[in-house]
Protein backbone atom coordinates (compact mmCIF):
# COMPACT_ATOMS: atom_id res chain seq x y z
CA UNK A 1 0.00 0.00 0.00
CA UNK A 2 1.10 3.61 0.03
CA UNK A 3 3.23 5.32 2.65
CA UNK A 4 2.87 9.07 2.55
CA UNK A 5 5.59 9.42 5.22
CA UNK A 6 8.26 7.53 3.23
CA UNK A 7 11.33 9.72 2.80
CA UNK A 8 9.77 12.67 4.61
CA UNK A 9 11.60 12.03 7.90
CA UNK A 10 14.67 10.18 9.14
CA UNK A 11 12.55 7.44 10.76
CA UNK A 12 11.33 6.27 7.33
CA UNK A 13 14.13 6.84 4.79
CA UNK A 14 13.94 5.66 1.20
CA UNK A 15 15.79 2.45 0.34
CA UNK A 16 15.68 -0.18 -2.40
CA UNK A 17 12.51 -1.82 -1.00
CA UNK A 18 10.80 1.53 -0.39
CA UNK A 19 12.41 3.72 -3.03
CA UNK A 20 10.01 6.53 -3.83
CA UNK A 21 9.49 9.96 -2.30
CA UNK A 22 7.74 12.34 -4.67
CA UNK A 23 5.00 14.96 -4.84
CA UNK A 24 1.85 14.19 -6.80
CA UNK A 25 -0.37 16.75 -8.60
CA UNK A 26 -2.82 16.76 -5.67
CA UNK A 27 -0.11 17.81 -3.19
CA UNK A 28 0.60 14.40 -1.66
CA UNK A 29 4.19 13.61 -0.67
CA UNK A 30 6.09 10.41 0.08
CA UNK A 31 5.26 7.07 -1.58
CA UNK A 32 1.80 8.39 -2.40
CA UNK A 33 0.59 5.65 -4.75
CA UNK A 34 2.30 2.62 -3.18
CA UNK A 35 3.79 -0.53 -4.69
CA UNK A 36 3.76 -4.34 -4.43
CA UNK A 37 6.92 -6.30 -3.56
CA UNK A 38 7.29 -9.79 -5.03
CA UNK A 39 9.30 -12.48 -3.19
CA UNK A 40 10.89 -15.74 -4.38
CA UNK A 41 12.29 -18.52 -2.20
CA UNK A 42 14.26 -21.44 -3.63
CA UNK A 43 12.29 -23.96 -1.53
CA UNK A 44 10.24 -24.28 1.66
CA UNK A 45 13.39 -24.63 3.81
CA UNK A 46 14.97 -21.43 2.45
CA UNK A 47 16.29 -18.93 4.95
CA UNK A 48 16.64 -16.14 2.40
CA UNK A 49 14.82 -14.91 -0.68
CA UNK A 50 15.10 -12.80 -3.81
CA UNK A 51 12.71 -9.92 -4.41
CA UNK A 52 11.73 -7.14 -6.76
CA UNK A 53 9.01 -4.54 -6.92
CA UNK A 54 6.30 -6.21 -8.98
CA UNK A 55 4.20 -3.10 -9.53
CA UNK A 56 4.47 0.61 -8.76
CA UNK A 57 1.17 2.44 -8.38
CA UNK A 58 1.09 5.77 -10.23
CA UNK A 59 -1.03 8.11 -12.28
CA UNK A 60 -0.48 7.52 -16.01
CA UNK A 61 0.51 11.16 -16.53
CA UNK A 62 3.37 11.11 -13.99
CA UNK A 63 6.99 11.28 -15.15
CA UNK A 64 8.63 7.96 -16.06
CA UNK A 65 10.88 8.13 -12.97
CA UNK A 66 7.71 8.06 -10.81
CA UNK A 67 5.48 5.91 -13.05
CA UNK A 68 8.14 3.20 -13.04
CA UNK A 69 5.79 0.41 -14.17
CA UNK A 70 4.78 2.32 -17.30
CA UNK A 71 1.07 2.52 -16.41
CA UNK A 72 -1.29 4.18 -18.89
CA UNK A 73 -4.87 5.48 -18.75
CA UNK A 74 -6.18 1.91 -19.10
CA UNK A 75 -4.34 0.49 -16.10
CA UNK A 76 -3.08 3.21 -13.74
CA UNK A 77 -3.76 2.59 -10.06
CA UNK A 78 -2.97 3.70 -6.56
CA UNK A 79 -2.74 2.15 -3.10
CA UNK A 80 -2.70 -1.60 -3.78
CA UNK A 81 -4.15 -2.98 -0.56
CA UNK A 82 -5.45 -6.54 -0.70
CA UNK A 83 -4.10 -9.46 -2.74
CA UNK A 84 -5.22 -13.03 -3.39
CA UNK A 85 -4.08 -15.79 -5.76
CA UNK A 86 -6.80 -17.92 -7.32
CA UNK A 87 -6.23 -21.63 -8.10
CA UNK A 88 -5.03 -20.75 -11.64
CA UNK A 89 -2.26 -18.50 -10.29
CA UNK A 90 -3.97 -15.23 -11.24
CA UNK A 91 -3.16 -12.47 -8.75
CA UNK A 92 -6.17 -10.38 -7.74
CA UNK A 93 -5.22 -6.91 -6.48
CA UNK A 94 -7.62 -4.70 -4.56
CA UNK A 95 -6.93 -0.97 -4.42
CA UNK A 96 -8.06 1.30 -1.60
CA UNK A 97 -7.26 4.70 -2.94
CA UNK A 98 -7.38 7.94 -1.03
CA UNK A 99 -4.52 9.55 -2.96
CA UNK A 100 -5.72 9.42 -6.57
CA UNK A 101 -9.25 10.79 -6.28
CA UNK A 102 -9.84 12.81 -9.46
CA UNK A 103 -10.86 9.55 -11.19
CA UNK A 104 -12.50 6.39 -9.87
CA UNK A 105 -9.60 4.05 -9.23
CA UNK A 106 -10.80 1.93 -6.32
CA UNK A 107 -10.93 -1.39 -8.10
CA UNK A 108 -10.20 -5.09 -8.31
CA UNK A 109 -7.48 -5.99 -10.84
CA UNK A 110 -6.44 -9.33 -12.30
CA UNK A 111 -2.71 -9.75 -12.95
CA UNK A 112 -0.30 -12.44 -14.09
CA UNK A 113 2.50 -12.50 -11.51
CA UNK A 114 5.45 -13.23 -13.84
CA UNK A 115 8.82 -14.08 -12.26
CA UNK A 116 11.18 -12.27 -9.92
CA UNK A 117 13.85 -10.77 -12.16
CA UNK A 118 11.69 -10.33 -15.29
CA UNK A 119 12.32 -6.56 -15.23
CA UNK A 120 15.47 -4.65 -14.37
CA UNK A 121 17.05 -1.87 -12.36
CA UNK A 122 15.17 1.45 -12.30
CA UNK A 123 15.99 4.77 -10.65
CA UNK A 124 13.33 6.86 -8.93
CA UNK A 125 12.82 10.62 -9.12
CA UNK A 126 14.82 11.00 -5.89
CA UNK A 127 17.79 8.99 -7.23
CA UNK A 128 17.16 5.68 -5.41
CA UNK A 129 17.91 2.57 -7.48
CA UNK A 130 15.77 -0.54 -7.08
CA UNK A 131 14.80 -3.71 -8.96
CA UNK A 132 11.45 -3.56 -10.74
CA UNK A 133 9.36 -6.20 -12.44
CA UNK A 134 8.52 -6.11 -16.15
CA UNK A 135 6.58 -3.08 -17.34
CA UNK A 136 2.79 -3.41 -17.42
CA UNK A 137 0.99 -4.01 -20.70
CA UNK A 138 -2.70 -3.91 -21.66
CA UNK A 139 -2.60 -7.57 -22.69
Where are these regions (language model features)?
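Sequence/structural signature of beta-propeller domains
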Residues: 1-139
